[in-house]
Amino acid sequence: MKHYLRGQLAKAARLNKETLRYYENNGLIPPAQRDSNGYRYYPAETLVLLEFISVAKAAGFTLKEIKELFSALR
């Protein structure tokens, strides 16, 4: 299973690291797993969530609405 470091995920999703941190801190994406080296690793599924967030934002949804949608689906 593929995993991304924070910088790799940010680049793949065309976001900056601060945005990933914001999304993580606000519950839009699950927290990264930390390895013994202290690096944060995200599973590949996180990229799918980020792509959905991007599409939903482009469609006019707020981050609050997106978070509520994710909560309803879980």
Tell where the protein language model's regions lie, with residue ranges:
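Basic helix-turn-helix/winged-helix DNA-binding cores
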Residues: M1-S71
